[in-house]
Each structure stands twice: as C-alpha cells, then as structure tokens.
A protein has these predicted regions:
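Terminal amphipathic alpha-helical/low-complexity segments used for targeting or macromolecular assembly
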Residues: 1-108, 196-342, 428-577
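Structural signal for interior beta-strand "rungs" in well-ordered beta-sheet cores
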Residues: 104-106, 110-202, 206-207, 339-340, ...
C-alpha cells in the first residue's frame, strides 16, 4: 500500500506530461481529463500527501496506549505500517516548517501556541508540546524503541519554554519541565523527569546545571505573515528538485522528437544526458539561492519569524537537501570548492564529507577534516528566537561522523572531536574531545606507514587518479535516471493499453520491480569495487578509499531511494547485507 501511494506521484506526473505532449501534437501521448489530472496533482503535492499520510497514520495507531507489546504482534505491525505510510506521504519535505505543527496535530499530538517544532513528530501521536517550547532539527521524537522481542511505546512531554537541542533523542516516557534545556546530541532516557529550569546533557543525559539564558525572556511579536512565508518556502523546497527533473525531461523529449527512433528507446538513450542536465540545474539553483540568501546575513539572535531567521532556516534546509540530491559531489576533491563557492571560508587540503552548515558563518582552516553527517554552525532555538553564529574549525582538526560544532564554537588547531560528539566553545591546540557535553580525551599517538603524500599532501598524479574515480560517481545518478525513465516508460505502456485506473493499481508493482533491479546493480557495484570488506587501515589517498566511496554513492543514490526507503523495518535490508543464514535474517529488522 505504501509503495502504491508513492507511485501515485509518478502516475500524476506521467498524466501531466501526456496532456502537455498531447496538446503539442506528439503522437505517443494520451490525453486524460484535466479534472482528473488536477485531482491527482493536488493529491500528490506535499500538502495533499501530508493530509493523507497524517490521518492514515492516525487511523492505524488509534487506541495505542503506552506500554510494551510483542514485536510480532498487531501493535508493532500497526506502528510499522503507520511509519511506512508517513514515509510514503513525503512528510520530510515539510520538516522544520509551519506545516509540521499541523501534521503533528493530524497525528494526534498536542501542540501549544508559539511552538517551534523543527523535526518530525511521532506517528503514535503520543506527544505533548506546551506553549513556546522549541525542538531543534533532527531530534528523535519517535517515542518508541524495539528490542529482540518487544516494542516499547511511551509518551513524550515537553514543558513551556523548554529547549531541545539538535540531534537529541527523547526516549519513551520523557518529561521535560518548563524552561528546561536539553543540549544538542543528548539522550534523555525517560527514567527521571527533567525538572524545570534544569540543563541536561550527555548520553544518557544527566543534570549539568541550570538552564542558561541565551535568549530574551519574552517571546517576539507573532508576525503571522511569516507563517505563510515558511509554509510556501517548504513547498518551494519540495518542488525545486522536480523543476530540475522537468528540465532534464524536456531535453530528453526534444532529443526524441529530433531523431527518427522509437519514443521509448529514444528516452532510454537520452536518459543519461537528461539526468546530468537535471543534476547540473539543481546544483545551479542551490548555489544561486544560497548566495542570494547569504547577502548581508549577520550572526546573532533574531526572531524565528523574521527575515534573518527565515534566511538561516532556508539556507540550512537547502544545504540538507543538497547533500541528498547532489550526493556524488560530496566527500570529493570538488567538495571544498563547492562549499567555498557557497560562501564558506575553506583553506587548502580540506576534506569535507556530507556536512550541513550555513556557509557564510563557517571557517575551516587548512588540512581539516569534516566527516560524514557533521553539523557545523547551524542554529539554536528558544522561546521564538533563533541564535546563529560563527563557527571555526582550526588547522588540521578533525570532526568525526555525526559530530556537532554548534554556533559560536571554535575548535583549535590539531584538535579532534570524536564520533557523535559535540565541540566545546573553546579549546586548546592539540586537544581531543568526546561526548556531550564534550570532555577531554587522552591523546594517543599512532604510528603508521602512510606518508604525507597519501594523507595530507598528495602528489599531482594522486589527485588526477582520485579525480578520475570520483568522476565515475556520476554513473550513480545516471543509473537512477535510467531507472526512472524505465519506470515512466512502463507506466506509459500500462496507461496506453490498460487505462489510468489499472496504471494506478499496478504502479506499486512497477516500483517494486525497479527497486529489485536497483538493489542488484548496487550489490554488483559493491563487489566489483571493494569485494568483501576486511578490517584494516587505509590512507585517505588510496584506491580502496576511492572505490569504497564510489560503491557508497550507488548505495545512497540508487539503492536508498529505490529499495531501502520502501523496505525499512523488514527482513529485506539485513538480507541485502548477505549475512550467512536466511533463518537468522528473518529475526532481524533494520529501520
């Protein structure tokens, strides 16, 4: 059902393409009444899918109460189905925007006045957000967790004016008191309530002091016009990739019309070029928008509902989307140039992976390394206010996977922030940090056989070889583009021969077949590039690292959207990992 819901956007786009092509006199097009096409388009827009996904999930989870239930039981299945329906509805496109408050209410959550909810609410609806509380991006509010035999479900309560830092986890049963503050990257277990005015940090979180007054005590003016501004902006963000795809598709149709070839064969032949055109168009749009929004952007505290607050939010959303749709551009030699062109100050020999930041506020010195999923700069929320500030990463410093360097942080040279850790406000040169709140970690010197030419200062020959391998990453979006063309071609055959109704019913089957093919291609690339992974150390400038990044691009760009997104929480993902026993795999779930 969830896959069929996802396929509706494909059918709607196909019907629109057919109507436009039919009006232009193209022979292979079939006209569908505009009333039906309009209804389909409204249904598959972010807002339309939001209503369907929200109320469908609420219907599935109606009557579920806090408690522990068998993993193989009905409650688990209902929650899993609600998650899949919500995912298919495209709820992520409205995260951090005005619409997410309405989506939370549609799920059954209680959302007070002046709440700034910049993350996804739980499908269970067991969430209570009191007036003027703030929840920053990527906070886990799912309200349940799964072990070997049970699913544990609980409520989450966030008090008035409370602040929940980015990438924190609130476990079932969490109670956050009024004016309390949970720092970024923390995990609140729910075993002990967070009292009013307290500041908690860590994983598991514990009290570290009193809540700091980083924002004005009184909320800013309501400014209702910005509610509409945020809402329209989220719709624009959802439509921007489609506009880029439309440019690529138009070039493909023009190619087919210019030569004497069967339309379907011509579209498949033109798919690689059309994909690259769409990829480039989206990149140019992202670059132009970020540069425009960064003009005269100043750090400091500003109302969320203001030009400054909106611009900071918009830029971070664009950067977050870019690392998904422009994934081949990241963790590459071109990545520092990309961030530099967006307005960040980036030194020489810098390595940047899938990092999210407000470029105008970030300085990265020579030889530094930002690993996967790092959050550099960003913003903090509190009582309707937003704080954005400059962040500096010192020379030859390292921020580990999913590390956080918040606004107004400075990491000294030759320093390290460990995986899933936060950066201190100030640090001494040569210091190591881990955890949240960050604590000093003893530095251990490791001797390796790798030379500077394979770590920090590669020779020209190595740069050329790496560039050649990284260029091959474009094969991943091209493969995804060919799959998309094949899906549309198959749906077109169904539309011409069996009609719109049958096409809608079989759309999910077509997507499942495409997902299976995407998985097969990705697995093949994995074995061709790196074979079986074995424990060991490899210098950054080595064939193994380059080829591993190449196969990972296929995982993220081909397998993830076509297969993994539709099979979360099932036994298919562990099976993809080619573990030795199918009997063992049947007991595993990856979400």
């Amino acid at each position: 059902v969830a896959v069929t819901l996802s396929s509706l956007q494909w059918v709607a786009a196909l019907a629109l393409i057919n109507n436009i092509a039919a009006s232009a006199g193209i022979s292979w097009a079939r006209h569908t009444p505009w009333l039906i096409v309009t209804a389909l388009l409204i249904f598959v827009t972010p807002l339309g899918r939001l209503v369907v996904g929200g109320y469908a999930a609420r219907l599935l989870t109606k009557g579920i109460a806090p408690g522990s239930y068998p993993r193989a039981g009905r409650i688990y299945l209902r929650v899993w189905a609600a998650e899949r329906i919500a995912n298919a509805s495209g709820y992520r496109s409205i995260a951090d925007a005005t619409w997410v408050n309405y989506y939370a209410r549609a799920l059954g959550a209680r959302v007070g006045d002046g709440v700034n909810l910049h993350t996804i609410p739980p499908v269970t609806g067991l969430l209570n957000l009191e007036d003027h509380c703030s929840v920053e991006p990527e906070v886990d509010l799912s309200g349940y967790w799964v072990d070997a035999r049970h699913i544990h479900i609980g409520t989450i309560h966030v008090g008035k004016n409370a602040r929940i830092g980015a990438r924190s986890v609130l476990m079932p049963g969490t109670v956050i008191g009024d004016n309390a503050h949970v720092e970024a990257g923390s995990t609140v277990t729910g075993s002990t309530p967070v009292k009013a005015n307290a500041r908690w940090s860590g994983s598991p979180a514990q009290k570290v002091g009193r809540s700091k007054h980083r924002f004005p005590d009184t909320p800013p003016p309501r400014r209702p016009q910005w509610v509409l501004g945020y809402g329209l902006s989220s719709l624009f963000l959802a439509l921007l990739p489609l506009c880029a795809v439309a440019m690529g598709g138009a070039s493909m149709i023009a190619f087919v019309q210019a030569i004497d070839i069967h339309p379907f064969l011509g579209m498949l032949a033109a798919a690689p070029a059309g994909t690259l055109i769409a990829f480039a168009a989206y990149g140019v749009c992202i670059w132009a928008l970020i540069r425009l929004l960064s003009l005269r952007l100043t750090p400091g505290v500003a109302p969320v509902r203001s030009a400054t607050g909106w611009r900071v939010w918009f830029i971070q959303r664009l950067m977050d989307d870019a690392r998904t749709y422009l994934f081949p551009l990241y963790a590459a030699q071109l990545t520092p140039l990309w961030f530099r062109s967006l307005g960040a100050t980036v030194g020489k020999d810098v390595e940047i992976s899938t990092s999210v930041m407000v470029p105008a506020f970030v300085t990265i010195r020579d030889g530094s390394f930002l690993a996967d999923d790092t959050l550099v700069g960003g913003y903090e929320l509190g009582g309707g206010w937003m704080l954005a500030g400059a962040t500096k990463i010192g020379k030859r410093s390292f921020v580990g996977n999913s590390g956080i360097a918040g606004p107004q942080r400075k990491l000294a040279k030759n320093s390290l922030v460990a995986v899933l850790s936060s950066t201190p406000k100030k640090s001494k040169a040569g210091s190591n940090w881990w955890g949240s709140p960050p604590e000093r970690m003893r530095r251990v010197t490791v001797t390796t056989d790798a030379s500077e030419s394979s770590t920090y200062r590669p020779r020209l020959r190595m740069r050329i070889l790496r560039g050649a391998i990284e260029t091959l990453r474009l094969l991943a979006p091209i493969t995804s583009g060919v799959l998309a063309t094949a899906v549309l071609a198959t749906l077109q055959v169904l539309l011409l021969n069996l009609g719109l109704g049958v096409t809608i019913l079989l759309g999910g089957v077509v997507l499942i077949a495409a997902g299976a093919l995407a998985l097969l291609i990705t697995v093949t690339m994995k074995w061709l590039c790196v074979g079986r992974h074995r424990a060991g150390d490899h210098p950054l400038w080595s064939w193994f690292v380059w080829l591993n990044e190449l196969q990972d691009t296929f995982v993220e760009v081909v397998a993830a959207p076509w297969f993994f997104n539709h099979t979360l929480g099932t036994g298919w993902i562990p099976q993809y990992r080619v573990t030795p026993s199918w009997r063992e795999n049947r007991q595993r779930r990856v979400d």
